[in-house]
Amino acid sequence: MITDLPKDLIEEILSRVSMTSMRVVRLTCKSWNTLSNSESFKKMHIGKVTSTREGESRVIMLIDYNLFLMSAVLMDDVDPSIEFKGKLSCLKEQVKISQVFHCEGLLLCILKDDTRIVVWNPYRQETRWIIPRYSHRPYVMNNIRYALGYENNKSGRSLKLLRFIDYCYTEKHICWHEIYDFDSDLWTTLDVTPHWYILSNWSCVQGVSLKGNTYWCAREENSDGYNHIICFDFTRERFGPLLPLPVNVIDNEYEYVTSSCVREGKIAALFQHNDSYPYELEIWITTKIEAEMVSWNKFLRIDIEPNNNIMVPFIYGGFFIDEEKKKVALGFDEEFGRKTFNIIGEDGYFREFDRITFNIIEEAGERAGVNCGSYVCSYVPSLVRIKKPAQGKRKRQSSLEKLRFDQNTWIFDSIYQATASQIRRRRPTR
């Protein structure tokens, strides 16, 4: 029997098990559960699961409220491939995830009903559940943004969660920014008076995590185009200045911009037209980026003649690139409800994957609504631990924070009541 083998040999055998199958290993027997949770085994196992073939990237996909692990290989001498590794199901209970945010191996998952948030390390199978102080109404879900970040201090890495809503009501810019500290287990309202708008969460457009901070595409308050990015610094707990994107969206007649993280601490920006002119896109990559400065370099431009019978897919929900191979894996094209995964490159290279996506959707079950588009991002497993709430008596919120919270809840309760009344008046009477 395998249990009679030496411990070192069992460790070597089990370390070859894929990340998505480790839950089965832990449930097999008590000794395997103990072994697989030891730090020595985790270091051995993560070394194997993070090793990849040349041109291979691990990818997390959000499809119809479920998360999946994929492998994408982008090579020059062979056709690219997309391999389904399995559904990520480390959570003890089945939940429906409407948004996901990736931060260095940790996943911030927003549930469908927006009543709970879970921060999750799929590799360590560690979670921390967080209850928002205030539950917003379903019709403003796309105006709520989330980000996970951290600051480095003497005791190590301190995780923080940013949650904010930008809402235009009767031509007024209403916002509420709050931050959750994992160490204190407290929410705090931030003093933010924005002169900008951050790109909304349509089709799961998310911020990009880089070195503990988060970057979003943004525009000036009285501007039409999203021509900037803006950084939230989790150490100083404040937004930086608007930083220029390399392409002026309006002047170059681009309608949409999407950002993504690139290996080695870079951000990529993808500019594209809408469906009316699907023949052109540009991708730029940062050469230097900090909270208050940025510089860019053009990575790839696709410009196809309309009579070639090839259209650049309109991309929803993220992308990732292989900088060396000059290839881009372009998330999902969801035209007419048909989800396809696309890879493009230099010299008109184009490859579309369809069947594998349909297989995933069939397994996923429930089809997502408007608050859950498809989303893709690169992923590297991490040994970072998620700190549990301190035991004992919880710290009390300050009187000033209680006042700020009461003021914001009164404002949004009033807005939602007025909006609900308007909706009722618009409904036809029978």
Swiss-Prot record:
Q: Does the keyword Transferase apply?
A: no
Could you tell me the keywords of this UniProt record? Kelch repeat, Repeat
Q: Where is the F-box domain positioned along the sequence? A: 1-44
Q: Which CDD domains does UniProt cross-reference here?
A: F-box_AtFBW1-like (cd22157)
SUPFAM superfamilies, alphabetically?
Answer: F-box domain, Galactose oxidase, central domain
- Kelch repeat copies, ranges: 161-207, 312-363, 383-430
**SMART domains listed in its UniProt record:** FBOX
Asked if ATP-binding is a keyword of the record, the answer is no
Q: Which InterPro entries match?
A: F-box-assoc_dom_typ1, F-box-assoc_interact_dom, F-box-like_dom_sf, F-box_dom, Gal_Oxase/kelch_b-propeller, SCF_F-box_component
Q: Which NCBIfam families match?
A: F_box_assoc_1
State what protein this is by name: F-box/kelch-repeat protein At4g33290
Q: Which organism is it from?
A: Arabidopsis thaliana (Mouse-ear cress)
